[in-house]
Amino acid sequence: MTSYDDKLDASLDLMRRLDPKNITKNLNDICTLIQNDGSETSEELTQDLLSSVDVPLRTQKCDETGKEYLCCDYNRDGDSYRSPWSNKYFPVVAQDSDELPPPFPSNILRELEVKANDSFDIYRDLYYEGAGTSSVYFWDTNEEDDEQETLDNGFAGVVLFKKETEDGSGKWDSIHVIEVIPEASSNATYKVTSSVILDLQNKKSSSLSLAGSLTRQLELTQSLSLDSALNVETAHLINLGTLIEKSEYNLRNLLQDVYFDKLRDIVMKDLRSVGDLSGKESDDKRQSELVKGLQSL
């Protein structure tokens, strides 16, 4: 009998081998196969697979504020998604008397979440050339039922960015899952798992495209006693902003300097084997257009 771990590993291995441009459809198809299996572990396996695979972010409009926000597993309850602008779920969650209410951050964390959304919206405007969408969601990590009144127990969250070029040839989704662990009254450790989902198409020629995802982790211990911070909450925002900026910078450099250079080496090797000069110039041009596509995101 195939073990649970073997099934999960096989599903993840299959996802890696399928066309990354169709990652959402591929994931849904595999989850459907798992559900149709009808085994006792089907539901758990489906949830683990969904949490292990990053898919392109979906944009939704907040019915109360009219602002767009990004949807992911971290702000989902059933088929509804919580807006960071109004702190309400849309579509409205239909709740029975015996059901638990949808999750919300504590009051103090919600206040920090509001400030974080405003701050990273400015970041998005500066670093994404005024385009795209950003959303930030925080949640309490304290397992006690009492309302959290301070951030002394730490918290977790996710920072999301999505941008698409005007002609649809380039799509960028970045997902930064964060965990904040206070080490002392004046220090905190920040753990960030950053994933980028990239899809670049050459509109002039369908023969060359680049799609896939990249994940990296970063961990730093930072001081909460900052001269520029009015309080601990502001210090957390400054530290998180610095960390996200560093992580995105590293990912962009890795994509452009490593993966695109590798793509060029592969193209050049193939051309030396079977191509001529005109073919080389044509492929160089297509590769250059893909690089420009990344730079425009």
Curated annotation (Swiss-Prot):
It comes from the Eukaryota. Keywords: Actin capping, Actin-binding, Cytoplasm, Cytoskeleton. It is found in: Cytoplasm, Cytoskeleton, Actin patch; Cytoplasm, Cytoskeleton. The keyword Transcription regulation does not apply. Residues 276-297 are annotated as: Disordered. Component of the F-actin capping complex, composed of a heterodimer of an alpha and a beta subunit. This is F-actin-capping protein subunit beta. It comes from Debaryomyces hansenii (strain ATCC 36239 / CBS 767 / BCRC 21394 / JCM 1990 / NBRC 0083 / IGC 2968). The gene is CAP2.
